[in-house]
């Protein structure tokens, strides 16, 4: 009996020992948390530039703020041309493109487009002294544009109306290079957006705008066509916030408003003065500027005296920085006609104004308030700020103050103020002029640095070649 029970128990246990399929557990690595916003861009005055003062540009500033909104670090990645930008976005090298690109049907087919940042016109550009184009159909093969640009889309649409219209495309050049080729007379026509044209003619005053080919075209950011829903949602939320709090309007004023006014004679004279006069005073501007950007100090001096140390005004101001006698005494300046003393006094006075300004004025706008004060007096600027506040405007935003300053010339408004009448309209033009001069100095400074870097590379390459030839001579090898 016991033997039977033992046998049954053994059989039961054996039956329970069937092979069990154990499913292999696959360990899924945790998702890597994103820490950087990679933004593809191209170099351009209003898009993205690197200077001794750091990175700048409309698209850069917006991208920096968007990265802050996402609580990510920003990495700007400049590419050589638009084709490379597209490839980088499609391959995932960058999360979005912020490069001053326009909204076009072709881009809508291939990417997701963000909301409009600002709007531009497309203009046909030619050189002063050559015939002004009257009709696009007459140009035939004389137009050169950038490959993959919005201008190719525009010309393709026009070609349906004018079948004989043809054009050349350049892949390895940017729009500013083509504009420089126009200025040198190397090509006849190109197309540029109105902001790039307006900025570039400050350095190349020979440029002229002919026909307007497209109006009010939106400048947008590009996102991948797939898997970008979350990023697009964040971008739209961010854009609405920036629009409501005035950031978009501020950046538009900062980068574009002051370049719309253009004076060919003044621009040519300034470029000549940079070559002929500035070298005499550059080191002094750099020294006495201290923590200020010396180029803003130099631009102010040019606006005041055209860098003439003996300049005099019927109102009593004198010297390179055109100081009044009381201001000179206050700054410890004995001789206003001495260039070094004048620069020292002007820098000290300007720095003093900056220190007096209310903390509510943002750092990136304080200089414009200070320059307006330098021109018409601190009290009048304070009057304008109070007027702005009474009108429901922001007294600490330059874009609002420049609208109010001209009102100081109207009795209806200046009778409400403490300091009375002032030529506020002149103060606005004064600041705009200095900003244009400053932008030109920055551009030329950057060009000179690029030339120096290229020259250093050439010399390094030549030295390497000489060393290689020397080594071959020592070993007895024949140079190739």
Curated annotation (Swiss-Prot):
GO terms for biological process: cell wall macromolecule catabolic process; cell wall organization; peptidoglycan catabolic process. The active site is at residue 304. It comes from the Bacteria. It catalyses: Exolytic cleavage of the (1->4)-beta-glycosidic linkage between N-acetylmuramic acid (MurNAc) and N-acetylglucosamine (GlcNAc) residues in peptidoglycan, from either the reducing or the non-reducing ends of the peptidoglycan chains, with concomitant formation of a 1,6-anhydrobond in the MurNAc residue. PROSITE patterns: PROKAR_LIPOPROTEIN. Its EC number is 4.2.2.n1. InterPro entries: Lysozyme-like_dom_sf, MltF, Solute-binding_3/MltF_N, Transglycosylase_SLT_dom_1. GO terms for molecular function: peptidoglycan lytic transglycosylase activity. Residues 260-480 are annotated as: LT domain. One of its GO terms (cellular component) is cell outer membrane. Pfam families: SBP_bac_3 (PF00497), SLT (PF01464). It is an enzyme of class 4 (lyase). It is a peripheral membrane protein. Residues 1-15 form the signal peptide. Keywords: Cell outer membrane, Cell wall biogenesis/degradation, Lyase, Membrane, Signal. Gene3D superfamilies: 1.10.530.10, Periplasmic binding protein-like II. Murein-degrading enzyme that degrades murein glycan strands and insoluble, high-molecular weight murein sacculi, with the concomitant formation of a 1,6-anhydromuramoyl product. Lytic transglycosylases (LTs) play an integral role in the metabolism of the peptidoglycan (PG) sacculus. Their lytic action creates space within the PG sacculus to allow for its expansion as well as for the insertion of various structures such as secretion systems and flagella. This is Membrane-bound lytic murein transglycosylase F. It comes from Shewanella woodyi (strain ATCC 51908 / MS32).
């Amino acid at each position: 009996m016991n033997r039977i029970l033992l046998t049954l128990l053994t059989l039961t246990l054996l039956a329970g020992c069937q092979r069990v399929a154990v499913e292999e557990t696959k360990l899924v690595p945790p998702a890597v948390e994103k820490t950087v916003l990679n933004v593809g861009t191209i170099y351009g005055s209003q898009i993205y530039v690197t200077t001794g003062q750091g990175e700048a540009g409309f698209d850069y500033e917006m991208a920096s703020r968007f990265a802050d909104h996402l609580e990510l670090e920003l990495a700007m990645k400049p590419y050589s041309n638009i084709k490379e930008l597209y490839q980088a976005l499609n391959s995932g090298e960058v999360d979005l493109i912020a490069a001053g690109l326009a909204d076009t049907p072709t881009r809508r087919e291939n990417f997701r487009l963000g909301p409009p940042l600002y709007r531009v016109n497309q203009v046909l550009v030619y050189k002063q002294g050559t015939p002004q184009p009257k009709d696009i159909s007459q140009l035939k093969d004389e137009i050169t544009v950038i490959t993959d640009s919005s201008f190719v889309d525009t010309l393709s649409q026009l070609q349906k109306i004018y079948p004989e219209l043809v054009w050349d495309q350049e892949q390895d050049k940017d729009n500013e290079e083509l504009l420089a080729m126009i200025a040198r007379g190397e090509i006849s026509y190109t197309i540029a957006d109105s902001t790039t044209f307006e900025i570039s003619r400050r350095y190349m005053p020979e440029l002229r705008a002919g026909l307007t080919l497209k109006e009010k075209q939106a400048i947008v950011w590009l996102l991948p066509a797939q898997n970008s829903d979350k990023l697009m949602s964040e971008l739209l939320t961010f854009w609405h916030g920036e629009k409501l709090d005035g950031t978009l309007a501020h950046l538009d004023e900062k980068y574009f408003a002051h370049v719309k006014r253009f004076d060919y004679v003044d621009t040519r004279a300034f470029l000549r003065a940079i070559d002929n006069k500035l070298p005499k005073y550059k080191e002094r501007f750099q020294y006495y500027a201290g923590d200020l950007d010396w180029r803003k100090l130099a631009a102010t001096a040019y606006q005041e005296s055209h860098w003439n140390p003996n300049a005099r005004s019927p109102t009593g101001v004198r010297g390179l920085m055109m100081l009044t006698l009381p201001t000179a005494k206050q700054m410890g300046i004995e001789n206003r006609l001495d260039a070094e003393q004048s620069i020292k006094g002007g820098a000290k006075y300007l720095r003093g104004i900056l220190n007096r300004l209310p903390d509510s004025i943002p750092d990136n706008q304080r200089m414009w308030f200070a320059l307006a004060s330098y021109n018409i007096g601190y009290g009048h600027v304070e009057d304008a700020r109070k007027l702005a506040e009474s009108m429901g405007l922001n007294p600490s935003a330059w874009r609002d103050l420049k609208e109010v300053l001209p009102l100081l010339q109207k009795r209806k408004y200046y009778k409400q103020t403490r300091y009375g009448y002032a030529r506020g309209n002149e103060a606005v033009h004064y600041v705009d002029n200095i900003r244009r001069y400053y932008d030109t100095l920055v551009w030329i400074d950057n060009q000179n640095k690029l030339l120096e870097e290229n020259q250093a590379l050439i010399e390094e390459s030549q030295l390497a070649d000489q060393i290689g030839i020397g080594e071959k001579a020592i070993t007895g090898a024949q140079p190739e």
